């Protein structure tokens, strides 16, 4: 981000140059489907718990991001921009746009959240003594989407599978809940 700002490179030019790499993201998501398929029976048995956890994680992520933005004095436009930070990039940009945010800035926030989760998420949960790979995967996938899911997959296929389902369900739940959350938050702005 700093390089883009200092070099005065428009975000649209950056995204156009990054298109081949971004296209590979779709391929990597498909590659995550095999471990997910291998865990399908166990995931199907726990669908109510998984959906509850993912819904709460989506709400928590949106509210905490918005609250920090408000504490820092952000405008409603910036609150709408950071609200979808924990959804995968294409969905987050669309949600941001729908709420009146700035999709390009949202994309940067999503990348930062993904990098933080992929680098630190699995390690932090391990240090906290969380041993259930299902919980690790759901947590990391909920807050750091595809990048976090890849780091989970490298550490443990079961965690990666749960992270995959978490990133998909968080995208769905967040896009459904974001307008409601933003409306509630705007009451306090």
Task: Describe every region a protein language model picked out.
Residues 52-92, 113-130:
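Transmembrane alpha-helices that form the ion-translocation and gating core
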Residues 78-105, 111-112, 116, 131-169:
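Alpha-helical membrane segments and immediately flanking helix-loop junctions
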């Amino acid at each position: 981000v700093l390089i883009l700002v200092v070099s005065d490179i428009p975000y649209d030019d950056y995204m156009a140059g990054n298109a081949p790499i971004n296209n590979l993201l779709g391929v990597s998501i498909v590659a995550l489907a095999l471990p997910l398929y291998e865990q399908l029976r166990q995931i199907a048995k726990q669908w109510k718990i998984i959906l509850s956890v993912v819904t709460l994680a989506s709400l928590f992520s949106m509210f905490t991001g918005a609250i920090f933005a408000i504490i820092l004095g952000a405008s409603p436009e910036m609150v709408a921009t950071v609200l979808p930070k924990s959804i995968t990039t294409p969905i987050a940009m669309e949600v941001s746009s729908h709420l009146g945010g700035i999709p390009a800035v949202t994309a940067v926030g999503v990348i930062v959240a993904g990098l933080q989760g992929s680098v630190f998420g699995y390690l932090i949960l391990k240090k906290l003594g969380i041993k259930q790979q299902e919980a690790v995967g759901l947590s990391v996938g909920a807050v750091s989407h595809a990048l976090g899911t890849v780091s989970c997959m490298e550490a443990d296929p079961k965690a990666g599978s749960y992270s995959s389902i978490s990133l998909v369900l968080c995208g769905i739940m967040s896009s459904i809940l974001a307008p409601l959350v933003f409306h509630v938050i705007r009451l306090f702005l």
